[in-house]
Curated annotation (Swiss-Prot):
It is an enzyme of class 3 (hydrolase). Changing S195A: 5-fold reduced phospholipase and lysophospholipase activities. 100-fold reduced phospholipase and lysophospholipase activities. The gene is PLA2G4A. The lineage of its organism: Eukaryota, Metazoa, Chordata, Craniata, Vertebrata. It comes from Homo sapiens (Human). Residues 409-457 are annotated as: Disordered. Ca(2+) 2 binds at D40, D43, D93, A94, N95. It is linked to Gastrointestinal ulceration, recurrent, with dysfunctional platelets: An autosomal recessive disorder characterized by recurrent gastrointestinal mucosal ulcers, gastrointestinal bleeding, chronic anemia, iron deficiency, and abdominal pain. Disease features also include platelet dysfunction, and globally decreased eicosanoid synthesis. InterPro entries: Acyl_Trfase/lysoPLipase, C2_cPLA2, C2_dom, C2_domain_sf, LysoPLipase_cat_dom. The modification Phosphothreonine is found at T268. This is Cytosolic phospholipase A2.
Length: 749
């Protein structure tokens, strides 16, 4: 039976934009007036401006001493057809100091019909004639993908990966336990999750991945999802030129060397100057800049210093043949004045796509950060390097550089990152990058001549760099406001219609809801206001959005894996989150994930926090659906926590420690020791600290391989009993209004 993906038939409503094309053809008899022409021959150019579109201002090149210029230059504007769009045409004269306006005219775009193309003459000063060619068409192929379904590339990956996993599971589990794997359809979907926790999470996850690789578990996984510190390890691993041919063991040796150095070495004046020069280039191109950009550079220099030009898109070559699990990364979109725990949209990143499932909007990775309007790119920038994304994914730790540098807390209110930059730049900076302004919209028409400006731009840049360095090492709001710490990108959903809300689980009313009452949903895990505003939409009028570390809401990347389109059967999660002590209950983040899932009607096994009281601290806990027959879509969760229990006694599973040296190396606490090197804010790991944490999680994982294997066998059996695990019957559809009419009218087989 072929698999039908019902999600591809759900309509994600969006309105098509219009593309307005203007060709500036020519002008004749350009004049500065009788007196002006006596003094100088015009150097004409044309400015085009439409205030209702983000990339609003365009200009032609200028011709020296030419009263009959022929430009033949083409410009495109993406327009909202519901707006009153007016084209302002300005004829300019380029001068060395200040350009001069020679005349203006306007054209109402709504006077044209879609599909129409015509030449329109404009008269300036009763003498000059300028001719423009204009055309209007519908943008029927937006750059955003509007869909609730997985992208075709991920679907192809899943099919290829299932064949690989089927053989790997047979080898791992043996003939008896894998006899249910008759075809790829019987293969359960296994996901591995890593939490946040700074370098502690990164180092711990390195030990986990080594164990999963050696044991063969990694070959049975479809996804590896990370958050914050875990994404740093995933980025290091997947960007390594020798992975997956070379396993984590050798790559982890390189990692240990990289994190043994003092991070202050990365903040020498010479290196900071290089960082800021890169930021100058980015800012000058019209992109927002925050301290997260610098933080990403520092993380990149530490972990992937010899591949700083690597991009997320380039990681596709690691997964295109399905030889390793698909990596999934995450950050949050947040609102400037609302707690992340109250409101946050989860943004997912893969080598194939970046987007927000809540709105059914996705884009190719190389478009993230570009300027969009109504789903169409209006200004494309170079793809952000992987280290920039690493800074965004772990941006909560950008504040730690206050501590590293000894910067005291600034109490200045209302001082944004952009205002801070404005204070230390000159008026010649290309864009002021204010949080919600459009640079081009606010440029004065009489601007300095570009050629003249180039003569002293380098001096201004040098001054900007000098002041930026001073800001980095002084008491600065750059460090002390969310505006300064949070990443910021152009809003790729600018101008979209979000009147329709799309639940993350639009197709089913899961039976798990029956066992989860309103009192439980109202019960607070960490904060009385947690998730209070998660149903609110993104502001589609804001020109830029804040993107921050997902750990600021909860520290496990379950939202990526719980998308029903991915149909995950078994989740193996590793939680490196900080706890008050080694003996503290380890379920806070998991309980937050459970509550978030229930509020989004996503299947999740009941988490019983009292298992800690009954069984004490363990290396891992297993949570299963209470009633598998009724909860067919509910995954099983194996939850590993950061705990040093059996590792103190055994150097390998079943192999006791014998010498005093072996016992001493394993005798350490993680959270109880006030001198512990495993603090969330520690970004330097001596070799011994690295090996201790790495080997601890390597041991804990290997020590529970049988638990993982048993869960895999059960997942195979669940698949056998529920062959339509990934598909959804229309009889279970909760929100049929989302389906297109053609799909609903088809006869049911």
């Amino acid at each position: 039976m072929s698999f039908i993906d019902p999600y591809q038939h759900i309509i994600v409503e969006h309105q098509y934009s219009h593309k307005f094309t203007v060709v500036v053809l020519r002008a004749t008899k350009v004049t500065k007036g009788a007196f002006g022409d006596m003094l100088d021959t015009p150097d004409p150019y044309v400015e085009l401006f439409i205030s209702t579109t983000p990339d609003s201002r365009k200009r032609t090149r200028h011709f020296n001493n030419d009263i009959n210029p022929v430009w033949n230059e083409t410009f495109e504007f993406i327009l909202d057809p519901n707006q009153e769009n007016v084209l302002e045409i300005t004829l300019m004269d380029a001068n060395y100091v200040m350009d001069e306006t020679l005349g203006t005219a306007t054209f109402t775009v709504s006077s044209m019909k879609v599909g129409e193309k015509k030449e329109v003459p404009f008269i300036f000063n009763q003498v000059t004639e300028m001719v423009l060619e204009m055309s209007l068409e519908v943008c029927s192929c937006p750059d955003l993908r509007f869909s609730m379904a997985l992208c075709d590339q991920e679907k192809t990956f899943r099919q290829q990966r299932k064949e690989h996993i089927r053989e790997s599971m047979k080898k791992l589990l043996g003939p008896k336990n894998s006899e249910g794997l008759h075809s790829a359809r019987d293969v359960p979907v296994v996901a591995i999750l890593g939490s946040g926790g700074g370098f502690r999470a990164m180092v711990g996850f390195s030990g986990v991945m080594k164990a999963l690789y050696e044991s063969g578990i990694l070959d049975c996984a479809t996804y590896v999802a990370g958050l914050s510190g875990s994404t740093w390890y995933m980025s290091t691993l997947y960007s390594h030129p020798d992975f997956p041919e070379k396993g984590p063991e050798e790559i982890n040796e390189e990692l240990m060397k990289n994190v043994s150095h003092n991070p202050l070495l990365l903040l020498t004046p010479q290196k900071v100057k290089r960082y800021v020069e890169s930021l100058w280039k980015k800012k000058s191109s019209g992109q927002p800049v925050t301290f997260t950009d610098i933080f990403g550079m520092l993380i990149g220099e530490t972990l992937i210093h010899n591949r700083m030009n690597t991009t997320l898109s380039s990681l596709k070559e690691k997964v295109n043949t399905a030889q390793c699990p698909l990596p999934l990364f995450t950050c949050l979109h947040v609102k400037p004045d609302v707690s992340e725990l109250m409101f946050a949209d989860w943004v997912e990143f893969s080598p194939y796509e970046i987007g927000m499932a809540k709105y059914g909007t996705f884009m190719a990775p190389d478009l993230f950060g570009s300027k969009f309007f109504m789903g169409t790119v209006v200004k494309k920038y170079e793809e952000n390097p992987l280290h920039f994304l690493m800074g965004v994914w772990g941006s909560a730790f950008s504040i730690l550089f206050n501590r590293v540098l000894g910067v005291s807390g600034s109490q200045s209110r209302g001082s944004t990152m952009e205002e801070e930059l404005e204070n230390i730049t000159t008026k010649h900076i290309v864009s002021n990058d204010s949080s919600d302004s459009d640079d081009e919209s606010h440029e004065p028409k009489g601007t300095e001549n570009e050629d003249a400006g180039s003569d002293y731009q380098s001096d201004n840049q040098a001054s900007w760099i000098h002041r930026m360095i001073m800001a980095l090492v002084s008491d600065s709001a750059l460090f002390n406001t969310r505006e300064g710490r949070a990443g910021k990108v152009h809003n790729f959903m600018l101008g979209l219609n979000l009147n329709t809300s799309y639940p993350l689980s639009p197709l089913s009313d899961f039976a798990t809801q029956d066992s989860f009452d309103d009192d439980e949903l109202d019960a607070a895990v960490a904060d009385p206001d947690e998730f209070e505003r998660i149903y609110e939409p993104l502001d589609v009028k804001s020109k830029k959005i804040h993107v921050v570390d997902s750990g600021l809401t909860f520290n496990l990347p379950y939202p990526l894996i719980l998308r029903p389109q991915r149909g995950v059967d078994l989740i193996i999660s590793f939680d490196f989150s900080a706890r008050p002590s080694d003996s503290s209950p380890p379920f806070k983040e998991l309980l937050l994930a459970e509550k978030w899932a229930k509020m989004n009607k996503l299947p999740f096994p009941k988490i019983d926090p009292y298992v800690f009281d009954r069984e004490g601290l363990k290396e891992c806990y297993v949570f299963k659906p209470k009633n598998p027959d009724m909860e067919k879509d509910c995954p099983t969760i194996i939850h590993f926590v950061l705990a040093n229990i059996n590792f103190r006694k055994y150097r390998a599973p079943g192999v006791p420690r014998e010498t005093e040296e072996e016992k001493e190396i394993a005798d350490f606490d993680i959270f109880d020791d006030p001198e512990s090197p495993f603090s969330t804010f520690n970004f330097q790991y001596p070799n011994q600290a690295f090996k201790r944490l790495h080997d601890l999680m390597h041991f804990n994982t290997l020590n529970n391989i049988d638990v993982i294997k048993e869960a895999m066998v059960e997942s195979i059996e669940y698949r056998r009993q529920n062959p339509s695990r990934c598909s959804v019957s229309l009889s279970n559809v909760e929100a049929r209004r989302f389906f297109n009419k053609e799909f609903l009218s088809k006869p049911k087989a």
